[in-house]
């Protein structure tokens, strides 16, 4: 297909999804328990993402064209004409996510990026929202008919369990995989992709605790404000965001006491929320139980959790204890936070240094924190795909500059991103054309 054909197809898919907006929202409320406003907002993000990639390829931004012209008179040896273009890698398998039934599922970022690159897509729909996936498939079918693109450009299988997922990754025609989900499931599929006779890239977005570092001056001047914001970010969507800020790190002292009190008060006001699936709720309950059983960890808030309902949980521990307990770095998917108390900046830097790979790391700082921040930012740059100052990570902007990945276990490929226009690069590979006539160039 040509770039113009692909762009028109992506735009038509967006139009067809919008045309089914009411039905998608209605079935989504029943399947996921998510509120209407959340589903409407996520649908807007999804169609905007499709149109963003259409605009991106219309100007050939994805081709990364580079041209070193021939130098036939160069001595001691002439240079041939050399041109580089990015080319599609082939069929891509995409796994729908449980927590974003639209933006990270059948028509989500992985699918949009792969189609924009020129790669056919096979989606494995998530069992948590088959009705939404069905409407999205209808939108794709209508867009295929309206634009005349090849009928095989989009295919979807709904559920089928682990057997279907593993078979998809093993299929010899699949050239790459996009995945958003748990560390356990993602690592199994990653290993399968690597064990193939012809290993393929597995772009997995897996687990992250997204730490916040509250530096001393900021803690003293606006600790209550930061604590309230943390509580809101921690419980947004029942904590079911991959960018949920699971730990806050700060120094011991009066500011810490006020921070803990404010966060506790704010979280106490949050009513239990319905989690997306029974499996996610059970995993959250197990994570809370494990946290209660960790030595040196004190519960500040311990909500009762029954069925699919999840109330906020808040724990605290010392940095010295956190540093000796690897289990405290394991993501608990849900509204659970840990306040980690360091005795001094050296210990705070030790926490930063000990972090596994993260999607995000956040600094809360004021003017008096600049010198301390300069010693911690170089550490965090090596730990995360996105660094924030004086904000909260649960909003992920879809734009050219966004990076949504990080070192393992945040993702399986720290040089890529699953959000933003650079996400298309996962499904392209560079090809150099030497002295090839223009008739054969992309």
Model-derived regions, located:
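N-terminal Rossmann-like NAD(P)+-binding subdomain of aldehyde/semialdehyde dehydrogenases
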Residues: 1-80
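Short loop-to-beta-strand entry elements in the cores of soluble alpha/beta enzymes
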Residues: 9, 117-132, 153, 198-216, ...
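Rossmann-like NAD(P) dinucleotide-binding subdomain of oxidoreductase/dehydrogenase enzymes
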Residues: 61-231, 253-256
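Short, glycine-/Ser/Thr-/acidic-enriched flexible segments
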Residues: 99, 128, 161-163, 174, ...
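Short, surface-exposed amphipathic charged segments that create phosphate/polyanion-binding patches used
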Residues: 168-173, 216-222, 288-289, 312-313, ...
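NAD(P)-dependent aldehyde/semialdehyde dehydrogenase
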Residues: 228, 250-359, 371
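C-terminal core of ALDH-fold dehydrogenases
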Residues: 307-310, 345-441
